[in-house]
Amino acid sequence: MAIETAENRTPKVIEVTEIMNMLPHRYPFLLVDRVTDYEEGKWLRAIKNVTVNEPCFTGHFPSSPVFPGVLILEAMAQATGVLAVATYGKMREDELYYFAAIDNARFKRPVVPGDQLVLEVEFLKEIRGITKFTGKAYVNGKLACEADLMCARK
């Protein structure tokens, strides 16, 4: 995996109940199940458990279900939202965190029911309220997806 941490530090975990206080998303669109570690303003690692009960599998594809790439990208974007809130604090009532742009998206392998996506996002820079991140998603230690993400908090 890309993000390396010191072996002697205790991981910072955020459970789904706290994630629901950080993000406005709800079923079926909350795509971050747990944060397994993060460092404010730098990086975050989270998981998304993919089950056969995901609503997308009724049509993508019923006889051979594959988790849609766009939902992997959305999961990475939601992970950046958790990192932003963990870094800068909870959003105001009238504020939203938007997925603004994506570049260089690459899908390396299919993600299927039973897989656990390990999402890794790293802060790159912020310019005029737009924050740029790089994101990667792994299954069993193998890269499934990578992309550059831009998000805005307004």
From Swiss-Prot:
Keywords for this protein: Cytoplasm, Lipid A biosynthesis, Lipid biosynthesis, Lipid metabolism, Lyase
Residues at the active site: H60
Reaction equation(s) it catalyzes: a (3R)-hydroxyacyl-[ACP] = a (2E)-enoyl-[ACP] + H2O
Entry's EC annotation: 4.2.1.59
Gene Ontology biological process terms from the UniProt entry: fatty acid biosynthetic process; lipid A biosynthetic process
GO MF entries: (3R)-hydroxyacyl-[acyl-carrier-protein] dehydratase activity
Subcellular location: Cytoplasm
Family: Belongs to the thioester dehydratase family. FabZ subfamily.
Reported function: Involved in unsaturated fatty acids biosynthesis. Catalyzes the dehydration of short chain beta-hydroxyacyl-ACPs and long chain saturated and unsaturated beta-hydroxyacyl-ACPs.
Protein's UniProt name: 3-hydroxyacyl-[acyl-carrier-protein] dehydratase FabZ
Organism: Haemophilus ducreyi (strain 35000HP / ATCC 700724)
